[in-house]
């Protein structure tokens, strides 16, 4: 599978974004998104999103991270299978452009992720190592992992879920 095919299956159509943001705001929620290129950053800037999330498979795209960080909004970086060096590089990219509004998400890159692979002890380790707020990108089919992550210091929760088990494209 190429990254192009992955993006084709994973992206939220641009024409949905303004309505999703409007509905989120009506519900008192903060709506932001993961851009995959500079064009999508510009699109999201035009919508005045308050923050950005860097998807785990973009953590080594330093030019993209610098461009996102240059908007001087909070940047939430999902770590997936990244090495500590990859994470340090992404953090440095944000700081290089003067943005220190950074948080990290501990992420198990498996869909769905087995609870046994959650490795939540990584959360306090990342918080200590990087001196940043750390959260969880939870791909498990359970709510227990997210709850346990808060006990271990998670400050942000991203929960993936499936709207329709018969439709693999309904993962949110």
Give the positions of each predicted feature.
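Catalytic cores and adjacent flexible loops of soluble metabolic enzymes
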Residues: 1-172
């Amino acid at each position: 599978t190429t990254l192009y095919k992955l993006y084709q299956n994973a992206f939220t159509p641009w024409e949905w974004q303004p309505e999703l943001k409007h509905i989120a705001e009506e519900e008192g929620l903060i709506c932001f998104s993961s851009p995959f290129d500079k064009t999508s950053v510009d699109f999201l800037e035009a919508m005045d999103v308050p923050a950005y999330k860097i998807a785990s498979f973009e953590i080594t795209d330093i030019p993209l991270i610098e461009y996102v960080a240059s908007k001087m909004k909070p940047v939430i970086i999902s770590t997936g299978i990244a090495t500590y060096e990859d994470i340090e590089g992404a953090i440095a990219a944000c700081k290089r452009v003067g943005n220190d509004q950074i948080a990290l998400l501990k992420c198990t890159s498996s869909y769905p992720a087995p609870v046994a692979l959650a490795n939540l002890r990584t959360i306090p380790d990342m918080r200590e190592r990087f001196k940043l707020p750390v959260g969880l990108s939870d791909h498990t089919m359970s709510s227990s992992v997210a709850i346990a992550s808060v006990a271990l210091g998670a400050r942000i929760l991203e929960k993936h879920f499936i709207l329709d088990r018969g439709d693999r494209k309904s993962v949110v």
